[in-house]
Amino acid sequence: MKNAGKNSAAALGMVCWIVYFSIYLGRLNFSASMGDMTQTGLWGKTELGSVAAAFYLAYGLAQIPCGILGDKISPKKLVSIGLIGTTAANLLFPFVDSVTGMQILWFLNGISQAMIWPPVVKMVINLTYGQQSVNIILMLSFTAPAGMLAAYLLDAVMLKAANWRYCFWSAGIWLAAVVLLWQIAIPIIEKKIEKVQKPIQNTQPGKRQVNKKKISLAASGVLWMLVATFIHGVLKDGLTTWIPTYLIERFTISSSLSVIISMVIPIVNLSGVYMAGYGNRTLFKNETKTGAVFFGVSVVCIALMMTGLSLPGSMVVFAVVTSMMTGVNTLFVSLLPMHFRGEGKVSTATGVLNAITHLGSATASILFGVLTEKFGWGGTEFAWCLCGIAGMFCCIIPIKRWGINRKNIYTEY
């Protein structure tokens, strides 16, 4: 019976991983296709940029409403709607020629994809508990870098073999298969887990105890963590967005080489997920304390960059800092919502934290572009350093309060 429960939890984690990994194929294909689309002469960079902006605007705005919905209706149904929506958007996109039509379709794609992460987290928390839940959530954190690499690899093949339209059709066909997987596999997994849980609950009623203590946003220090979440979004995407341009202008390398070098970053970032999981459970046992350490390491690395490093040295700094921010993302966007299980607000908390992260990302896109033009890369490096310091203090301030109010997500649930 115990092995059956583990197998069912593993199957749940695998299906959820495939789902969230797959939506990157139907998101990043537009970015990968922009160069080929501009070469047709039908659309300009500004017009296509507005289409990309429509997606991120919709994705960010829909996070909180979709998070709340995930706590109100069936997470399984909400994910299904989101998957069907993003599948349709990708399959239809190549048939649309007008910029307005593209904006509308990609805006709807953003809303559809916003329906997936909060309810997926909610479903994992509902069907598993303790270390099982944490393991699956940490495993899902690997989908971002893995999905990014897979998306660019698939799109590179499609662009070389055919044209930009096939980037969307290939993603749409894959997503359609994922819809079928979700519809078939999840009901089976739910039934198996329910069969395992009922005997355990009847024979060992005291084993799964839930901490009923409610978390106060002000008294627990969660508000400080919300600010830290925003800052990590600014710093993480502020770096990843500008790394290729930084390398080109600082070291006068070709744009193609800068992109190839930059592709190493997502692979290295996988280590950030592991460090967050290990550090939080074994070393620091407090999300704010772990986050403060990660921000602190980032500050030291950026300060070293400001002294004038070589190309390899700069790449090491970028790799370390973005890995640290991947770790912070794991702490605050993946693990922190698990503390709100007792309140029944896991999906809502996930949506809010994800929205704040994307607000930080949007801020970074504008802020660092302006800073680079006005103050050069030296001024931008200084701004990165200030962001790291601010994030570190936002984590340090609530350490004691959060230590008192936090729940042991590894054993209590």
Predicted regions mapped to residue ranges:
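Cytoplasmic membrane-interface "Motif A"-like loop-to-helix N-cap segments
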Residues: 72-82, 281-295
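Conserved MFS/SLC helix-loop-helix module at the cytosolic interface between two early adjacent transmembrane helices
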Residues: 61-99
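Helix-to-loop junctions at the C-terminal end of transmembrane segments
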Residues: 62-74, 273-285, 372
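A late C-terminal transmembrane helix in Major Facilitator Superfamily
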Residues: 340-375
